[in-house]
């Protein structure tokens, strides 16, 4: 029996190490258990590479078995300590090697040195410009590790790798000691190059870059390692602790052993995102009419605050386990926050963990500043009482005086937090430590009213929470839901699009690119198999950029702009079939371009653009300066954006096609043939038979649509109620009794229940719960295979697939892709396929590849090539490690050895099902989805116009006419309508009166003149249907709340100061309103 390892909790470091700020919470000083020692020989690293190749090539439902095989072989041959292996499988979660400070550019320079390449040679340029197209060259681009593999393979003389897993880990430790220079990295990488094959170096490079590209993350890996592993990881974020605590697969944790602990970072609970986010649906999902909590949504950084020793030691970390104690202070008297709040707790509070948001408070203007100012505020002006400072806004308490509170209901935790037992007069710490503003509600009306109040106080939105739920680490569900307001001139979401071209300006913008053509990427992501992505034109943007932005666009990219020839457009651009809307004066190659963030009022159909619709009144909100022209380094939180990371067509369709609808043949051209699945006729369920009430908002897929389940009994992991919720989540109805026509699908693991035996007497199929789990893992309802049936009717026994095993059925691989099509696995057994499919059925199969299946196919082809080059000795070692115990690509003489894996009715079944779900969830999180559309097989047909984001009503639309699409480049306020908050206008509209100063009146008169001169329309009534903005002076802002309330419908209006108008005129463009709200 395993024993717990003792832990010595070391306080987190507070100073910089080797001049570098720590990026992850420090690992715990951990003592290895006495019997958790590896006594066998570590395998050669190429064995792990073989497993990684298989993980990359296998379908999701096969990865769990492969992982359990890896871990089982390791325990048998090496020992119980799997940490050296798991840290290689999850490099981005390795806290002992948090950063290598090695990105693609540095690795490219190092390998140019190691391979003795001439700097300007083609090979060197392929490494340096690894994302750029290679013309007609067969060499891959877009995947740096694969580019390196090709260059190394062409020059390496290493036929068999010499390094073990232990040796590779030691070399990686050397690379991660801190920030080094190229001359320091080269000797270590050269040692790797001299002892590793090109294949091994490819995987080492992926480990260094912390992205293995195997579509599996911590949930899948840890679920295969141990049933309790993910629960423990969620509360400690420490792989070593997980591996050393759960080294014995037979040991199970008690519930109190997965509690939160002091000075251990954990993965916090996050907000879910609803497909249909109307306030009524949000209220239903959150439990209305039961009471719920509404909190103000804050624009800061999620932070955990740990304190112990009656305030002697403090620890701050982000939701991604980044340690910020060096900023805020580890001890009283230190940092930009701890020194001011160290005395805030009651004397009897020995230790505590708080969850909250770190904001920036400006004491001069008495308001919170933008999130981007947080780090500078935390670093500077420790002793300046007038300078902006960090302010921790608390919304939850999770630990108190050695007791974890995460399993207490939210209502209890809230009551304790505000009881006066935690803080001494927290109001005395205003601007440093505060409660999040919150209120109770019971319906959509309460949400609407509180949202209005938050907007009136210049807030961002709400978070609505259920009161009767526990705190769930690393969860993003409907227990917490985010609510944001909508404004009259913009949609709820901004888009990140790539610039494809531009038009020369006139007048004041003469000689500059004044309008930009932007597009959406066709490839969903960079898989390294194409030279570069192609783009469909989407919108043109000429507003929102300042004078300096136009200068940067012209000067930094002067050599990249090329004349556009309408008769011979560049091949990467897919244009609209009609008109000149997307025919620019100049274009720019994607690899030289940059990404901009755009907001707009709505989406409208438009045949003049390649995608078939465009944005109405688009405005540039932010420019992501490309790496080559940036004059500064990105910080830890920043994300590089380029042609591979800009918004894709699929991303766009996902964002603006909610709620999702399954495609059917009635939706127009480009019809997709589907394999027919025999399903029970939908019945109208009498309310008494429905059982628990579940919201339609919880439905995420249509796997079981048109099916009704009668679940008699569940499993230990999924009791009856949970199983009902699961099938509902995937589109099914459920009933508490069999339907009159006996069409409800009966689910039970056995026939012990009298209700089940009654169904059997009527000849009704009784199906095991595993059928549900396996169907979800494959994203389609499986046929009734014998191994899933407790009792089979004569009709089921006559079924085509009844006597096939799941393994045999998988060879045909009717795995539903994300667009609803069925796929034939090219590696499927041809004989089996012919045996169970007739010609007519084959014609019904849509053989268009989904993105993930294409990646797996290419990975299998790559695997075949690599396996064909194995030496006899390597093949023997692979066989000993289970890599050749089943059919490897190209082998035909080996058979699967997993016949019994699903037939054994034991705890292994439920663990396997749980593991399959974890693998599936990892794939969902790790990639951009492919979505329903009516695009044809060739991909050239237009998709259906999104369901939401499109406005089919002319009333209340922006613009002087429904045909207006863009802001005017010369008259920047044209198409906008302004109400000026003067005392005279207030009287006309029945608003509160005021006596503004002469200066205030003068400023508003001047602003009105500027608006009219630059195309704006001034409205005297706040009820004007076209109203978009309200101008309010800082010195007469008493009507802010009143105007916010009275102009909220149908969408809210921007309330800005006269300074916004003046700065827009100076910059000759529309600027971001968020920076100009009245005080």
Swiss-Prot record:
PROSITE patterns: BRCT, DNA_LIGASE_A1, DNA_LIGASE_A2, DNA_LIGASE_A3. Mg(2+) 2 binds at residue 460. The gene is LIG4. InterPro entries: Adenylation_DNA_ligase_IV, BRCT_dom, BRCT_dom_sf, DNA_ligase_ATP-dep, DNA_ligase_ATP-dep_C, DNA_ligase_ATP-dep_cent, DNA_ligase_ATP-dep_CS, DNA_ligase_ATP-dep_N. SUPFAM superfamilies: BRCT domain, DNA ligase/mRNA capping enzyme, catalytic domain, Nucleic acid-binding proteins. It holds the Pfam family BRCT_2. It comes from the Eukaryota. This is DNA ligase 4. GO terms for molecular function: ATP binding; DNA binding; DNA ligase (ATP) activity; metal ion binding. Residues 699-789, 968-1078 form the BRCT domain. Its EC number is 6.5.1.1. The active site is at residue 297. GO terms for biological process: DNA biosynthetic process; DNA recombination; double-strand break repair via classical nonhomologous end joining; double-strand break repair via nonhomologous end joining; nucleotide-excision repair, DNA gap filling. Coiled coil: none annotated. The keyword Translocase does not apply. It catalyses: ATP + (deoxyribonucleotide)n-3'-hydroxyl + 5'-phospho-(deoxyribonucleotide)m = (deoxyribonucleotide)n+m + AMP + diphosphate. Mg(2+) 1 binds at residue 357. It is found in: Nucleus.
């Amino acid at each position: 029996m395993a024993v717990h390892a003792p832990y010595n909790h070391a306080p987190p470091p507070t100073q910089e190490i080797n001049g570098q700020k720590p990026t992850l919470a420090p690992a715990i000083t951990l003592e290895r258990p006495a019997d958790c020692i590896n006594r066998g020989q570590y395998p050669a690293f190429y064995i792990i590479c073989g497993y990684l190749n298989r993980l990359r090539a296998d379908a999701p439902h096969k990865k769990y078995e492969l992982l359990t095989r890896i871990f089982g072989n390791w325990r048998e041959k090496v020992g119980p300590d799997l940490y050296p292996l798991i840290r290689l499988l999850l490099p981005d979660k390795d806290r002992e090697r948090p950063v290598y400070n090695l990105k693609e550019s540095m690795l490219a320079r190092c390998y140019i040195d190691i391979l003795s390449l001439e700097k300007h040679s083609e090979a060197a340029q392929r490494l340096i410009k690894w994302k750029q197209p290679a013309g007609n060259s067969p060499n891959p681009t877009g995947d740096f590790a694969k580019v390196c593999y090709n260059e190394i393979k062409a020059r390496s003389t290493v036929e068999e790798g010499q390094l073990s897993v232990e040796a590779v880990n030691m070399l990686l430790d050397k690379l991660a000691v801190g920030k080094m220079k190229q001359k320091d990295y080269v000797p270590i990488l050269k040692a790797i190059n001299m002892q590793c094959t090109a294949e091994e170096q490819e995987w080492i490079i992926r480990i260094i870059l912390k992205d293995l590209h195997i579509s599996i993350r911590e949930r899948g890996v840890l679920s295969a390692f141990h049933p309790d592993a993910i629960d423990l990881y969620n509360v400690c974020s420490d792989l070593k602790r997980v591996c050393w605590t759960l080294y014995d697969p037979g040991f199970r944790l008690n519930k109190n052993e997965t509690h939160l602990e002091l000075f251990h970072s954990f993965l916090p609970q996050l907000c879910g995102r609803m497909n249909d986010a109307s306030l009524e649906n949000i209220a239903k999902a959150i439990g209305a009419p039961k009471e719920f909590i509404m909190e103000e949504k804050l624009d800061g950084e999620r932070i955990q605050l740990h304190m112990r020793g009656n305030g002697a030691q403090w620890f701050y970390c982000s939701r991604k386990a980044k340690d910020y104690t060096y900023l805020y202070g580890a001890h009283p008297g230190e940092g930009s926050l701890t020194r001011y709040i160290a005395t805030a707790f009651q004397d009897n509070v020995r230790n505590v963990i708080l969850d909250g948001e770190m904001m920036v408070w400006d004491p001069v203007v008495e308001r919170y500043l933008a999130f981007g100012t947080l780090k500078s505020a935390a670093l500077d002006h420790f002793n300046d009482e007038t300078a902006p400072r960090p302010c921790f806004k608390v919304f939850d308490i999770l630990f108190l005086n050695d007791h974890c509170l995460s399993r207490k209901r939210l209502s209890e935790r809230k009551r304790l937090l505000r009881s006066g037992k935690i803080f001494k007069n927290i109001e005395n710490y205003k601007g440093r430590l505060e409660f999040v503003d919150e209120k109770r509600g019971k319906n959509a009306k309460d949400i609407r009213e509180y949202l209005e109040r938050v907007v009136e106080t210049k807030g961002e939105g709400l978070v609505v929470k259920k009161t009767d739920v526990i705190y769930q680490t690393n969860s993003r569900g409907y227990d917490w839901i985010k609510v944001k307001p909508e404004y009259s001139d913009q949609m709820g979401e901004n888009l990140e699009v790539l610039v494809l071209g531009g038009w020369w300006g006139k007048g004041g913008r003469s000689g500059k690119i004044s309008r930009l053509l932007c597009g959406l990427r066709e490839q969903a992501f960079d898989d390294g198999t194409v030279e570069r992505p192609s783009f469909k034109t989407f919108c043109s943007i000429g507003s929102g950029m300042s004078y300096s932005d136009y200068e940067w666009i012209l000067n930094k990219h002067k050599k990249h702009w090329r004349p556009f020839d309408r008769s011979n457009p560049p091949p990467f651009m897919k244009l609209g079939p009609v008109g000149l809307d997307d025919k620019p004066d100049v274009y720019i190659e994607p690899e030289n371009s940059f990404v901009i963030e755009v907001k707009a009022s709505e989406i409208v159909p438009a045949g003049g653009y390649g995608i078939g619709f465009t944005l109405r009144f688009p405005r540039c909100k932010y420019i992501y300066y490309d790496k080559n022209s940036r004059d500064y380094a990105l910080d830890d939180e920043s994300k590089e954006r380029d042609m591979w990371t800009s918004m894709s067509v699929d991303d766009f369709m996902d964002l603006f096609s909610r709620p999702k609808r399954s495609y059917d043949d009635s939706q127009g051209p480009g019809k997709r043939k589907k394999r027919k699945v025999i399903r029970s006729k939908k019945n109208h369920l009498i309310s008494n038979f429905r059982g628990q009430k579940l919201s339609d908002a919880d439905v995420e897929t249509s796997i079981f649509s048109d099916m009704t389940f009668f679940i008699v009994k569940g499993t230990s992991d999924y009791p009856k109620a949970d199983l009902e919720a699961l099938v509902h989540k995937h589109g099914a109805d459920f009933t508490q009794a069999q339907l009159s026509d006996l069409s409800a699908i009966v689910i039970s693991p056995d026939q012990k229940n009298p209700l089940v035996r009654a169904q059997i007497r009527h000849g009704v199929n009784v199906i095991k719960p595993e059928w549900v789990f396996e169907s979800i893992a494959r994203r389609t309802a499986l046929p009734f295979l014998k191994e899933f049936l407790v009792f089979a009717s004569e009709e089921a026994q006559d079924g085509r697939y009844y006597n096939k095993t799941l393994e045999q059925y998988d060879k045909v691989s009717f795995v539903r892709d994300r667009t609803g099509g069925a796929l034939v696995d090219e590696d499927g057994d041809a004989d089996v396929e012919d045996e169970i499919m007739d010609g007519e059925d084959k014609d019904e199969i849509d053989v268009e590849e989904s993105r993930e299946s294409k990646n797996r196919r290419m990975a299998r082809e790559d695997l075949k090539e690599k396996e064909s080059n194995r030496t006899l000795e390597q093949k023997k070692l692979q066989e000993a490690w289970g890599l050749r115990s089943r059919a490897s690509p190209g082998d035909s003489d080996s058979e699967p050895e997993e016949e019994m894996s699903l037939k054994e009715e034991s705890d292994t079944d439920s663990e396997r099902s749980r593991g399959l779900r974890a693998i599936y969830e990892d794939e969902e999180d790790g990639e951009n989805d492919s979505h329903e559309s009516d695009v044809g097989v060739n991909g050239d047909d237009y998709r259906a116009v999104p369901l939401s984001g499109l406005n089919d009503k002319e009333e209340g639309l922006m613009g002087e006419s429904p045909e207006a699409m863009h802001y005017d480049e010369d008259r920047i306020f044209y198409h906008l309508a302004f109400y000026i908050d003067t005392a005279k206008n207030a009287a006309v509209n029945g608003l509160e009166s005021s006596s503004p100063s002469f200066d205030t009146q003068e400023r508003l008169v001047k602003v009105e003149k500027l608006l009219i001169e630059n195309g704006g329309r001034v409205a005297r009534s706040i009820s004007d249907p076209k109203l978009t903005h309200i101008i309010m002076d800082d010195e007469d802002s008493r009507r802010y709340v009143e105007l916010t309330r009275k102009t909220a419908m149908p969408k809210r209006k921007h309330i800005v100061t006269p300074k916004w108008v003046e700065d827009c005129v100076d910059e000759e463009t529309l600027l971001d309103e968020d920076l100009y709200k009245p005080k």
